[in-house]
């Protein structure tokens, strides 16, 4: 499985040769965040309209158990609120403006719930769901899987990724049908033998021929 994180990709013979004949999946990282605030419904709508194969998004859980789509554990960068996601209720998160930092045109854009995103994307685009776990939210993996199943996202249109191998282990125990990807800063050791990682997401400058062959 190969995912290419970019906004436009020419489908020519030279490209296909470079990637070993595998057709890349065009994945919009945090949605189309060049034109709209990252991890918001406007960014996801733009990715759909531009014909992407998948959207990569990040999920966390509020203090009252709602799975929301946002990248940083601290909400200050995108909302101005200096607080952790897991310390706030969903009602508190839903009051935050997640768009004004990007442009005044997106003022009052909210942090979406995973359920809202699934309602938007179902039947229109696939997903790469990155789970961002916390010791404060042990139910995050199970609730994420429950929602994906409820809205018809399966191994044909969804992968689950994480920087936490423990999270991937939990996902495989809950839902072995989902392809799981381990996000690595560096490829060190026999990581490719890890049983609960079906593929790896590695920064391009660290990829070697030996890594690909392994």
Predicted feature locations:
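Phosphate-group recognition and catalysis centered on beta-loop-alpha active-site segments
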Residues: 1-214
């Amino acid at each position: 499985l190969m995912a290419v994180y970019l906004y436009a990709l020419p489908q020519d013979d030279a490209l296909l040769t470079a990637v070993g004949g595998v057709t890349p999946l065009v994945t919009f990282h945090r949605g189309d965040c060049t034109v709209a605030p990252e991890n918001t419904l406007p960014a996801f709508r733009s990715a759909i309209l531009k014909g992407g194969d998948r959207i990569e998004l990040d999920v966390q859980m509020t203090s009252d158990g709602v799975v929301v789509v946002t990248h940083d554990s601290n909400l200050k960068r995108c909302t101005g609120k200096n607080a952790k996601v897991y310390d706030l209720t969903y009602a508190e998160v839903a009051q935050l403006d997640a768009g004004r930092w990007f442009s005044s045109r997106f003022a009052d854009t909210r942090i979406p719930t995973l359920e809202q995103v699934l309602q938007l994307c179902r039947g229109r685009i696939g997903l790469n769901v990155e789970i961002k776990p916390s010791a404060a939210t042990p139910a995050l993996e199970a609730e994420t899987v429950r929602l994906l199943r409820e809205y018809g996202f399966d191994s044909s249109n969804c992968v689950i990724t994480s920087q936490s191998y423990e999270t991937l282990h939990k996902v495989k125990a809950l839902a072995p049908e989902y392809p799981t990807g381990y996000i690595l800063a560096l490829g060190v050791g026999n990581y490719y033998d890890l049983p609960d990682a079906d593929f790896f997401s590695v920064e391009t400058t660290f990829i070697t021929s030996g890594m690909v062959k392994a």
